[in-house]
Amino acid sequence: MTKKILSIVLCAVLALSVFAGCGQSSTPAATQAPAAPAAPAATQAPAATEAAPAAPEAAPAKDYTIAVMVKDSSTPFWRYLVSGAMEAGTDLGVNVVEYAPMEAQSLDEQTKQVEDAIQAGVDAICIAPVDSNGIVPAIEKANAAGIPVIAINTKANGGKIETFVGIDNEAAAENLAKYMVEQLNGEGKVVIIEGNPAGQTSVDRVAGFTNILSQNPGITLTVSQPGYFKRDEAMTIMENLIQKDPDIDAVLALNDEMALGSWQALDDAGLTEDVIVSGFDGAVEGCKAILAGKMVASMDQDAIGTGYEGVKAALTILEGGTVDEWIKIGGKVVSGDNAQDYLDNFAAHGFSE
């Protein structure tokens, strides 16, 4: 009798074990993509960076590779942009591959890199064109291969572009020019150090500057000359201008690198007390220069946010979604009032220079 009872108990235990096992799935729980990093405290820093998009609930439909093409690999601005793109790749679960010409601003190299990316079978291309017209044939090749192209920072003037991610360069330049005219009290001789005249970025910024300068009768634009976004080029230009005529009141450079090169030439000539300088990027060194009194202003472009939003837009398109024709970010004047806020934001992303 005892053995019979024991047998019944054991059978009951076994049955309960089986039913308990059926209540648990043998498939592991779905792993979510890593969450986006917590946004820094609200400051004057780039809006797109502060409000970084949250990671998707599930991984993308396939293992996408997105090429991010910049104009050079050494300038801090482009390092920030690539960092934002890589951050998006981690958050959104896609592979991001950087392409940058060995020679800064080289159209030939960038064209070859687009062709290489097509051959490698990338799923999308985010590109900051070195030459807005010259890059069009390469973009058309990507179009023909069925690869969506997103323009970042600089517009392309042809081919099919899914969206442009970046600042409104002309409007931003107008705002910066207004600030500089205020610093001059509406009077003075001004020099513009342009970027690459073949790039739409440079064209738009020069247009923005000249729009405002021409509206102020007390302002004289004495020279507007390309420095190709290079510090040493800008320094040489300023050295030559100073030798010809040192009567300069302000320098408006189209990026921080050229602003700092211009300042160095002015400093060597003992003219920094008489001339105010502005840049365009809101990069770490530019912000530090503003706080040190070397520059009076720059323009926030939110490079980190540009890279992030470019990759995010590419993924949205690859997944069959739609994006705005122009994803606008950045556009605030960086001055002594908010430069430290920008430095704090860069530090939160691991950049101190």
Where do the model's predicted regions map?
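Hydrophobic core
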Residues: L10, L14-V18
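Positively charged n-region of N-terminal signal peptides that target proteins for export
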Residues: M1-L10
